[in-house]
Amino acid sequence: MLDRWGADALRDSDGTKLDAATKALDAKIYTTYFVARGHNEFAQEHMDECQQMLLMSKHNVATENTVTIDFLDGYYREQVVADYVHDPKKWWEVIDRTTGEVVPVSCWEVDQDKDLVTIKDAVPFHEYTVSFFVYAIWDPTQMYNHITNNWGDKPHDIPFDVRQANSGAFAKDYLKQWLIDNPDTDVVRFTTFFYHFTLVFNDQAKEKFVDWFGYGATVSIKALEEFEQEYGYALRPEDIVDNGYYNST
């Protein structure tokens, strides 16, 4: 087949591996390498270092002075979970979309057991949204391949954030050892690299929104803290979610 197709290289892919006999053929060997996923044993011990995203709830119309928002409604809960490690009152944002005003943190509360935000002193018939941080607990590229190819009970790859101390050190150390352990590899094919393009799924496990040039999957609380430290001003959640447009391009 190599001769008939004129191939000069062989490569694996997400979900496949080349066996030793194949790697010994007279061809260049490309090996897929995942920098920040595919290491669940490490990731499960550092779930507070999962990659993060800022998402926005659906627009919810208040019909009385109190409105409760299921902010994860419409999102795939096998992909994301709300971040309660960090204080929602500091990092989340509730907005009256009718006026564009930010709702004071004193006027809303989070039910962490039910993933709900309740707003008091709401204006009837105004629309409200919640912008909130999540942890990504399933790598979206592997999730797409997993669902499309019906991989069944194959474990879900947990993406970790190399900006974090433990994850960054693990990624460096693992790569050094991997290079030693894979002498037959001619080309390391980095896949996903550190972060994804923006890829978020809905509650039917279908693509909810995709931005091939988006940076939404690079946003984390640590990143925002470091941004403020370097530039002297803080970004708001709205700078990222952009009323649901996610500031694409």
What does each model-identified segment do?
Residues 1-249:
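Glycan-processing catalytic domains of CAZymes
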